[in-house]
């Protein structure tokens, strides 16, 4: 075995040990194919710089699945997920690979990115379980096809958690859970989020801090439960959640 392959295998084992889950041969092949397709498509459109080696396996795959550690212990269970702002397909496609009985909706407002997501889903054999939607979260959250229809609504947050929560909560069914993936997390952010969630008829179920392997830093996951049906006025019109965020 070459040195590169040994290092790659050791890195993979570290990730699977961290997750307490390991992919089947088919799932591993799907992840490898996904990596190849990302590299190919990156030449056409700017998707992500995290496509090589540890960048892909730790900062993309592991970062997508580690917050779902509990769900990974029972990957056979069927759930409906929606990934908001799916971009290059993480965490949504990683979840679809790891959870073979679940259905995933990938939502992004960029038609270039959703074209990529559709092609990749088909190429790696997931198009029967992945639905790709080109729409803003504020619009999709009011669409009766999607509203109150998911077990999990997920986002790797770029915006503040109180803004992201307004995008996610309207998608949840009565027992659903919103998951916000964050890097750092503070008590101030927690208090602002609590106030925002009160307006959305939701609450923080818990927060959990993870340390990514291979010195990739700290991640926080915020799990949110609905306490009642999300008020009909949310999400507000396009741009308003960012311009006038809840929680203040």
Swiss-Prot record:
* Name assigned to this protein: Ribosomal RNA small subunit methyltransferase G
Lineage at the top is:
Bacteria, Bacillati, Cyanobacteriota, Cyanophyceae, Synechococcales
Q: Which InterPro entries match?
A: rRNA_ssu_MeTfrase_G (IPR003682), SAM-dependent_MTases_sf (IPR029063)
EC nos? 2.1.1.-
Extract the Gene3D superfamilies matched here.
Vaccinia Virus protein VP39 (3.40.50.150)
Q: Which gene encodes it?
A: rsmG
User: What family name appears in the similarity comment?
Assistant: Belongs to the methyltransferase superfamily. RNA methyltransferase RsmG family.
Q: What does this protein's UniProt record list under function? A: Specifically methylates the N7 position of a guanine in 16S rRNA.
**Where is coiled-coil annotated?**
none
Question: What Pfam families does the record point to?
Answer: GidB (PF02527)
Positions with a binding annotation for S-adenosyl-L-methionine: 85, 90, 108-110, 137-138, 156
The principal location of this protein is cytoplasm
Q: Where is the signal peptide?
A: none
Q: Which of UniProt's keywords are assigned here? A: Cytoplasm, Methyltransferase, rRNA processing, S-adenosyl-L-methionine, Transferase
Question: Top EC class per UniProt?
Answer: transferase
Report the locations given in the UniProt record. Answer: Cytoplasm
GO molecular function, a single term: rRNA (guanine-N7-)-methyltransferase activity
> Its GO CC terms?
cytosol
Q: Its domain of life?
A: Bacteria
């Amino acid at each position: 075995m070459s040195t590169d392959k040994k290092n790659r295998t050791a890195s993979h084992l570290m990730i699977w040990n961290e997750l307490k889950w390991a992919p089947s041969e088919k799932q591993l092949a799907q992840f490898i194919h996904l990596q190849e397709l990302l590299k190919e498509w990156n030449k056409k459109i700017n998707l992500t710089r995290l496509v090589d080696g540890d960048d892909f396996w730790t900062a993309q795959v592991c970062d997508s699945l580690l917050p779902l550690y509990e769900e990974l212990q029972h990957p056979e269970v069927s759930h409906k997920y929606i990934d908001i702002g799916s971009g290059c397909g993480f965490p949504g496609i990683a979840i679809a690979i790891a959870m073979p009985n679940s259905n995933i909706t990938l939502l992004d407002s960029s038609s270039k990115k959703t074209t990529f997501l559709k092609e990749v889903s088909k190429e790696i054999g997931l198009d029967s379980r992945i639905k790709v939607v080109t729409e803003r979260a504020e619009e999709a959250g009011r669409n009766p096809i999607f509203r109150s229809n998911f077990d999990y609504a997920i986002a790797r947050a770029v915006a503040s958690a109180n803004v992201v929560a307004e995008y996610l909560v309207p998608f949840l069914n009565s027992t659903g859970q919103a998951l916000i993936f964050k890097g750092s997390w503070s008590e101030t952010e927690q208090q602002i989020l609590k106030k925002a969630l009160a307006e959305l008829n939701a609450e923080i179920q818990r927060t959990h801090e993870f340390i990514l392997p291979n010195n990739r830093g700290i991640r926080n996951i915020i799990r949110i439960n609905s306490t009642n049906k999300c008020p009909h006025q949310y999400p507000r019109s396009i741009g308003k959640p960012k311009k006038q965020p809840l929680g203040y």
